[in-house]
Every structure is written in C-alpha cells, then in structure tokens.
C-alpha cells in the first residue's frame, strides 16, 4: 500500500487562507489535509468546509474531535456535512482531547466514552433506528438523522499513544494517529499495542494504518527552521514527551520547559530543547533534513506521515517547500 503524505493545519487563519493552502497542497501532490482540534482555536469544521470546496482529490478530516466537548450526534452531523461537501473524502478523527481542564470539562472513562461515541456516530450515519444504550451515551429507538448522508462509513482514525487506546484502535479503527511524534522508534511500539486489540477482534494488525505527525518547520535556512521548531514544539513537549517510552529525557527538561511555557516564554523554553530531543518530536531543518526524517518513518512502515503546522517560517513558504523540495525526495 502506498504511503500517504499529509499536512496538518492549525485553525487560526483568516477566511480564504485555508482554501489557498489546500489548493497549493493538492497541486503539489499531498494526499490528506487535516485540521487540528486544539482547545480555543477555530472549530475544525470551518476550515475543513472551506478546503473541501477548494479541492477535488485530497482526503479531509479533523484530528481530532473529542466526545467531551462535542456530543456524538453533533460529531456525526459535522462528519456527514464534510463528507457531503467533499463528495466522499472525509474521515473522522476522535481522541480524548487535551487541555479541557482549562474549561472545566472532566474526562472520565475515556476508553468507554470514545468507543460509545463511535457506536453512536456510525449508527446515525448508517440510519440504524434501533437505539443504543451505553454506559455513557445513548440513542432512543427511532432517533435518526433527518437528511441523506454521502456515505455510512467514512474511515475512522483514533488519536492515541498508550497501550489501552492503541488496543481500542486495533479493534475498531482504520488508522491510529500518534500526534506530536516524528520518532521512528515509536512505530514498532504502537504496532505491538495495536496488535492486542486487532487480534481480539479477529483483525490483521496491518489493516490499521499508523500515522505519525508533528510540528514541522522547513526552510533553506536550516538553522532558522530548527530555531522556530524549538519554539513551536515547546508547548506540546510537556504533553507528549512522557508518553514515549523510547526517549530518555534529560533530567527536569520537561518540567523546566513546561514552566517557561506557562510563563509565556516559549522561545526560552525552546532553547532548552536539545537536537536529539527535537528530532523525536518535530520535523525541522532544510528540505533534505525533513525528507530524511520522513523517510525514516516510511522505512519502518507508517501508513501516513503528517507534516504539522507551521510548516515553515511562513505557512505558504513551508507548504511550497514541502511540496516542491521534500515530496520529490521521498521513496514510498
């Protein structure tokens, strides 16, 4: 199966910018366009619908929505809307969500909550009126969407790092995304974690695609690109660094980076991140350096590499360099 290359966009841009970036990405040959679902940014459906109208080939989806801040029936509706607007190119990305404590949202029973949300979403898309009674969510018998959908079964991606989340993906998902990682050593770890769930469901673990995506900054000035990547990755490091069992972090690095980020000093936080750590959690440098990082993931069997925001010293420059100078270097 051909490896896909995608772009991950942050939803912080003016109207019109998403369409322009999406058209450029499709022309360059990217396969998938993802919009993040990070707290307090624009809802992903806005940029996704704009990009759907501007493209005709690429797959589109949010990575990820969460069933704590958005009810499953609303997730089903937004997925159906995107699939209609894109004529069948949408996928659903679901995860437990991050930073929701800032808005007072507890996240109990995440595995059950995600699995039942998936049940509700796909029952609604299939037109199943039989009802559903779960431990977290339910549908009364007869409850159904009041419009025709494009497809009853858009692909499902789950965002997860840990053994239990990956096992759930192995049972029910088409893809698993390890967000915030550019580390090829995580791929066999995730594959084994998927295997436990896949075997339980009678599935081949190879049927579940592994997606790795991370902050990306590419430029012909490699040092400037890596400096910007350090600043960008600092806010995510405290979230994901301790989830990677293959990386040994310098003493107190995550704590010190987190304290500086909390104080609004992202550049100072980024300067603490050494090269070897940066390369595990971001794609950065010259086109040749970024291509080498992506190729390392392809060589260990990922289904998709996702180059995340901000792409370059500017979005437009980054997307252009990724398409014109990185994609041609990849063997897939």
Where are these regions (language model features)?
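Active-site-adjacent structural elements that line small-molecule/cofactor binding pockets in enzymes
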Residues: 1-332
């Amino acid at each position: 199966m051909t490896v896909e290359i995608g772009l991950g966009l942050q939803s912080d841009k003016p109207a019109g910018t998403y369409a322009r970036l999406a058209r450029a990405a499709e022309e360059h040959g990217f396969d998938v366009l993802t919009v993040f679902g990070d707290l307090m940014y624009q809802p992903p459906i806005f940029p996704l619908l704009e990009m759907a109208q501007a493209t005709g080939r690429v797959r589109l989806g949010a990575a990820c929505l969460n069933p704590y801040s958005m009810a499953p029936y609303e997730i089903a509706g937004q997925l159906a809307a995107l699939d209609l607007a894109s004529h069948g190119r949408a996928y659903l990305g679901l995860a437990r969500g991050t930073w929701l404590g800032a808005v007072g949202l507890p996240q109990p029973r995440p595995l059950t909550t995600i699995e039942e949300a998936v049940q509700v979403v796909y029952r609604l898309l299939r037109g199943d009126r039989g009802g559903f009674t779960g431990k977290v969510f339910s549908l009364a018998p007869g409850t159904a969407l009041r419009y025709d959908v494009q497809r009853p079964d858009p692909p499902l991606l789950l965002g997860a790092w840990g053994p239990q989340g990956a096992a759930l993906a192995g049972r029910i998902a088409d893809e698993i995304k390890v967000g915030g990682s550019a580390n090829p050593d995580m791929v066999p770890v995730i594959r084994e974690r998927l295997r436990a769930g896949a075997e339980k469901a009678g599935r081949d673990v190879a049927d579940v695609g592994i997606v790795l995506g991370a902050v990306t900054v590419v430029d012909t000035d490699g040092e400037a690109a890596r400096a910007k990547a350090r600043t960008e990755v600092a806010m995510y490091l405290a979230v994901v660094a301790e989830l990677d069992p293959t990386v040994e972090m310098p003493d107190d690095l995550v704590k010190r980076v987190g304290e500086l980020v909390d104080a609004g000093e992202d550049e100072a936080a980024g300067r603490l991140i050494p090269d070897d750590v940066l390369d595990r959690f971001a794609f950065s440098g010259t086109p040749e350096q970024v291509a080498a990082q992506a190729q390392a993931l392809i060589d260990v069997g990922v289904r998709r590499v996702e180059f995340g925001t901000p792409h370059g010293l500017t979005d437009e420059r980054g997307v252009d360099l990724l398409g014109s100078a990185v994609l041609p270097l990849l063997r897939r």
